[in-house]
């Protein structure tokens, strides 16, 4: 028996007030529908049917590289009609799991529990109890047994008082699902083909119906406007922050970080407020992240420190290395063990060796820098001639004085010293002192210009 997942994603989302299809609006680092697709894949599904309609080009551009069966719903005539479009792709012996592209927070564990309670030849529906069930289809029971689902607009006063509601998520045997869908009618207040009507059909046919509930109601909430989208974003962030804390991170304020990717944390990690994580980020043990830092696709080793307002993108920090405040590490940058860059230092596609330091106001691009090197303030590796990039090599123990320009390609030998204000255009041998600045002149009796009166 195979698991065949149908994801409904055909709606425009008019209340979003956007040209973007509703399901492509993002939660954290990926679209709502991508969250749902990823969850479906985590269940080991044999196939995923994506029912689409509005914004087909944008959907296919965003999702087209994935293993999806694209099912067109040319007219939006209700949820039952949407699922019916996938009938040709459903086998009789499939278990069909129906999900929604605008319900991104549904968890794998919740769906596994739903599938576990589905009878062999029956169906299982995911329900939730809400204090205010307005707008939702009510679960109608008789002597505890589910006999149907009644939509809000079709419900009477007694049914409106029910607070157990339908989430729309259900697991259904393929053979019966196709038969029930073919029997649907649009004779209702909306003039639509309701998927929920198959519950009453199942009851009439004597098919066993079971229910399951999510761990929290937020899992089954959708986003129809940007306010609801923001609420789901906050819920996602709270869940992600909780996961980080359980893994060993100390968050100064869990409500004031943003996690837009996959973050792995070691023990005793300290994270201050307003930090943003994007992409794949790995934090070792005892790492400290200062306020306002941005970490993107980076690897931070044990005991390293990212000081406030530092940007680390596509870079690596070794053990006990530190960066910032107000530093920028661009893709390809690597700080080896105990290396340090300070405020207003930018490093790109370069390695700063063990124990080496660039304390402030420097640009290090396309550079290979050894161990124990001191980079003075105002130092620049001039790596670009307007057409090509070139490498600067600085070997172990070099002292680079302030305001030095190294015009690549150039190599500075071990333990060499470069005088402040020098422009280095030729290789420097080991242990040499090089000074290229103009000789200082003293002009006595110098008169400053006087401002001309107009």
Curated annotation (Swiss-Prot):
Keywords for this protein: Acyltransferase, Cell shape, Cell wall biogenesis/degradation, Cytoplasm, Magnesium, Metal-binding, Multifunctional enzyme, Nucleotidyltransferase, Peptidoglycan synthesis, Repeat, Transferase
PANTHER family reported in the protein's UniProt record: BIFUNCTIONAL PROTEIN GLMU (PTHR43584:SF3), NUCLEOTIDYL TRANSFERASE (PTHR43584)
Annotated segments matching region Linker: 227-247
UniProt key word Nucleotidyltransferase: yes
Oligomeric form and interacting partners: Homotrimer.
Organism in which the protein naturally occurs: Shewanella frigidimarina (strain NCIMB 400)
Superkingdom: Bacteria
Chain segments carrying region N-acetyltransferase: 248-454
Function of the protein: Catalyzes the last two sequential reactions in the de novo biosynthetic pathway for UDP-N-acetylglucosamine (UDP-GlcNAc). The C-terminal domain catalyzes the transfer of acetyl group from acetyl coenzyme A to glucosamine-1-phosphate (GlcN-1-P) to produce N-acetylglucosamine-1-phosphate (GlcNAc-1-P), which is converted into UDP-GlcNAc by the transfer of uridine 5-monophosphate (from uridine 5-triphosphate), a reaction catalyzed by the N-terminal domain.
Record NCBIfam families: glmU, PRK09451.1
Catalytic activity: alpha-D-glucosamine 1-phosphate + acetyl-CoA = N-acetyl-alpha-D-glucosamine 1-phosphate + CoA + H(+); N-acetyl-alpha-D-glucosamine 1-phosphate + UTP + H(+) = UDP-N-acetyl-alpha-D-glucosamine + diphosphate
GO MF annotation: an example: magnesium ion binding
Known pathway: Nucleotide-sugar biosynthesis; UDP-N-acetyl-alpha-D-glucosamine biosynthesis; N-acetyl-alpha-D-glucosamine 1-phosphate from alpha-D-glucosamine 6-phosphate (route II): step 2/2; Nucleotide-sugar biosynthesis; UDP-N-acetyl-alpha-D-glucosamine biosynthesis; UDP-N-acetyl-alpha-D-glucosamine from N-acetyl-alpha-D-glucosamine 1-phosphate: step 1/1; Bacterial outer membrane biogenesis; LPS lipid A biosynthesis
Residues binding acetyl-CoA: 377, 383-384, 402, 420, 437
UniProt-recorded name of the protein: Bifunctional protein GlmU
Protein family according to the UniProt entry: In the N-terminal section; belongs to the N-acetylglucosamine-1-phosphate uridyltransferase family.
Gene behind the chain: glmU
BP terms from Gene Ontology: cell morphogenesis; cell wall organization; lipid A biosynthetic process; peptidoglycan biosynthetic process; regulation of cell shape; UDP-N-acetylglucosamine biosynthetic process
